[in-house]
UniProtKB/Swiss-Prot annotation:
Keywords: ATP synthesis, ATP-binding, Cell inner membrane, Cell membrane, CF(1), Hydrogen ion transport, Ion transport, Membrane, Nucleotide-binding, Translocase, Transport. ATP binds at G155, G156, A157, G158, V159, G160, K161, T162. NCBIfam families: atpD. The gene is atpD. GO terms for cellular component: plasma membrane; proton-transporting ATP synthase complex. It is found in: Cell inner membrane. Coiled coil: none annotated. This is ATP synthase subunit beta. Changing V363I: In strain: CCUG 17874 / NCTC 11638. Belongs to the ATPase alpha/beta chains family. It is a peripheral membrane protein. Its EC number is 7.1.2.2. It comes from the Bacteria. F-type ATPases have 2 components, CF(1) - the catalytic core - and CF(0) - the membrane proton channel. CF(1) has five subunits: alpha(3), beta(3), gamma(1), delta(1), epsilon(1). CF(0) has three main subunits: a(1), b(2) and c(9-12). The alpha and beta chains form an alternating ring which encloses part of the gamma chain. CF(1) is attached to CF(0) by a central stalk formed by the gamma and epsilon chains, while a peripheral stalk is formed by the delta and b chains.
């Protein structure tokens, strides 16, 4: 047996124990095995997770382990799992070990990077807070993202998480000329498939790299896929000096797969059955998502909240890292207002006069106050009707309804379905529009003119057309 070869001594589902004669592979080192199942040649990559003593290691498989038997020869790679990086990954789908899985010509990468890397040091990190303009009115106004920040995207099934993700990818590609990386962490294969074809239709595929480790895969693949995607994003930040957008769908599944791996490795669980290292594992991933003096990685992470319990250790460990939250609300979607972002529930760390300026802060808080007052008046309106309100309250209700409508916006990626052309609204236009509504400049314009438009100029044109017709 060659020095770097070992043999399998035990297979426990996705966990494989291997014994080496003289060589001891390091933690996180990759192991390779080629074997045959029912006449089909298969290759499997494993990652060393623990040293058991006496040249024995316990490794986590990155794919199914059926067909493995004891005494099979397994080879240490002498390095970690490495994945392709660079512009050649754009428009392609990869699995956790960096193989293309989109049935196109297999990629022969000219450059690969290991998936486990150090987070940027304090000296490398950029400390200035800069707003990241998305072109989506409700986000830029009420819960702005910061460059290199982390955003939690909360929402149930079918309220439009994917559409917002696609619109952000589109806007980053066309307005900031940047790239995006999408990591599908333990989500449905069907959703991954839909996303690929929707991106193809929406024309954003050539600006994004997709990495999928879906629900049906072993915990090792579901956990490490987040690092695969992050490594691709880090290349664009560190080597190309770009501002990259990184999507993780779903960050809860990263914690969940970590809990499965932890149990398989025989570690004693902590609260609610999660791994004892939950906070550390979450930090290891999140700390790599940062702004450096070269470029930035801004991440949008979809967060599934099990049983709507925000105190569950997994979502709670994510909250500690988030700079902004974008909450999608089904009630808003039912009104036909898209994006269905809840203007009162969504938050941002940078929504303060020091960070975004006095004007933006005043307009944003003014809008929230009007919407909150409208929410408080809902019960009175339901019981007594609008006529019983004071003149001032009637004005508040009118303005709030206009604001609600004006928070809707036609998306570029939804053009195919809605037929209305998408709109990118600059922050300047957003502030001008909402500031004008608060000042009462547009009290004479019917509220329907505010629905599904971009800037306030379009509202005025729409109102003019409505009047003429």
């Amino acid at each position: 047996m060659k020095a770097m070869e070992g043999k399998i001594i035990q297979v426990l589902g996705p966990v494989v124990d291997v014994e080496f004669e003289s060589y001891l592979p390091a933690i996180f080192e990759a192991l390779d095995i080629n074997f045959e199942v029912n006449g089909v040649q298969k290759s499997l990559v494993l990652e060393v997770a623990a040293h058991l003593g006496g040249n024995r290691v316990r490794a986590i498989a990155m794919d199914m382990t059926e067909g493995l038997v004891r005494n099979q020869v397994i080879k240490a790679r002498g390095k970690m799992i490495e994945v392709p990086v660079g512009e050649e990954v754009l428009g392609r789908i990869f699995n956790v070990v960096g193989e293309s899985i989109d049935n196109l010509e297999p990629l022969k990468p000219s450059l690969t990077w290991p998936i486990h890397r150090k987070a940027p040091s304090f000296e490398q990190q950029s400390t200035k807070t800069e707003m990241f303009e998305t072109g989506i009115k409700v986000i830029d106004l009420l819960a702005p993202y910061s460059k290199g920040g982390k955003v939690g995207l909360f929402g149930g099934a079918g309220v439009g998480k994917t559409v917002i993700i696609m619109e952000l990818i589109h806007n980053v590609a066309y307005k900031h000329n940047g790239y995006s990386v999408f990591a599908g962490v333990g989500e449905r294969t069907r959703e991954g498939n839909d996303l690929y074809f929707e991106m193809k239709e929406g024309g954003v595929l050539d600006k994004v790299a997709l990495c999928y480790g879906q629900m049906n895969e072993p915990p090792g693949a579901r956990n490490r896929i987040a690092f695969t995607g992050l490594t691709m994003a880090e290349y664009f930040r560190d080597e190309k000096g770009l501002d990259v957008l990184m999507f993780i769908d779903n960050i809860f599944r990263y914690a969940q797969s970590g809990a499965e791996m932890s149990a398989l490795l025989g570690r004693i669980p902590s609260a609610v059955g999660y791994q004892p290292t939950l906070a550390g594992e979450m930090g290891k991933l999140q700390e790599r998502i940062a702004s450096t003096k070269n470029g930035s990685i801004t991440s949008v992470q979809a967060v599934y909240v099990p049983a709507d319990d925000l105190t569950d250790p997994a979502p709670a460990s994510v909250f500690a890292h988030l700079d902004a939250t974008t909450v999608l609300n089904r009630k808003i979607a039912e009104k036909g207002i898209y994006p269905a972002v809840d203007p009162l529930d969504s938050t941002s760390r940078i929504l303060s006069p020091q960070m975004i300026g006095e004007k933006h802060y005043e307009v944003a808080t003014g809008i929230q106050q009007v919407l909150q007052k409208y929410k408080d008046l809902q019960d009175i309106i339901a019981i007594l009707g609008l006529d019983e309100l004071s003149e001032e309250d009637k004005k508040t209700v009118e303005r709030a309804r206009k604001i609600e409508k004006f928070l809707s916006q036609p998306f570029f990626v939804a053009e195919v379905f809605t037929g209305s052309p998408g709109k990118y609204v600059t922050l300047q236009e957003t502030l001008e529009g909402f500031g004008g509504i608060l000042e009462g400049k547009y009290d004479h314009i019917p509220e329907n003119a505010f629905y599904m438009v971009g800037s306030i100029q379009e509202v005025l044109e729409k109102a003019k057309n409505m009047k003429n017709s």
